[in-house]
Amino acid sequence: AYIVVYSTGTTGPDLLFGFSGQISMGPAAFFAIGAYTSAILATKCGVNPFFGIFIGSFLATVAGLMLAIPASKLVKHFLSLMTIAFGQIVYMFVNACAPLTGGSPGMRNIPYISIFGYELNTYFKNFVFGLILLILVLIVKNNIIRSRTGRAFIAIKENTAAAEGMGVNVRVYKAMAFGISACFTGLAGGLYAHLVTYISPETFNSTQSVLFMTMALFGGIQSLIGPIVGAAGLMLVKEVFQFLQIYQV
């Protein structure tokens, strides 16, 4: 189940970096927005988590588009610094707003996703549901990269000046890439919250952003199944190290 969650989340950074050439070190922020939005709606407002994860994904998209407005004017290194700062702002916000987010101790007893009364209360059920969403995300991603939008992303990555010369609105397409990336990662955040039923700010620190980027690079950028390979590979490595630590091999 964790593999499909992280595969979905890694699809966002892979699209942003692999196809549009924008380096974001803040995917954990969108992961957090999706997770906390869905968790808050479910625990405090009584919203069905099935709808909550999509609302969280939508808010993550809005946040991505808002960040993209100033970010579209920045070059790679300054863009990375800006996204790191955004990630820290989100991290500090969820720490500070204890009445809403639970603060440092986190949020507990987050309900499982329920579809027409059928509760996804096991890892296998969550795996199947997450796999369906992952397949849909990959279909959307594949359609995007094969469309005019995808070709515009690649043109911007290869040569921004040349892309502008061909009539590509660079700022608009950069913003679109940011928004789509945030949408995918926010969706994964919602899935994560209702899978583990407990979230805290430490789950969404800068290490999480590095993990997403590492998975994208490990699986191979500009690849449809790269996020799956990267997530599965690093999750396997993590399990091996935990096994060695437990049994002191």
What is the role of each PLM region?
Residues 28, 54, 64, 174-249:
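Transmembrane alpha-helical segments in multi-pass inner-membrane proteins
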Residues 2, 6, 35-36, 57-61, ...:
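Residue-level recognition of pore/gate-forming positions within transmembrane alpha-helices
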Residues 45-88, 229-233:
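Alpha-helical transmembrane segments within multi-pass membrane transporters and channels
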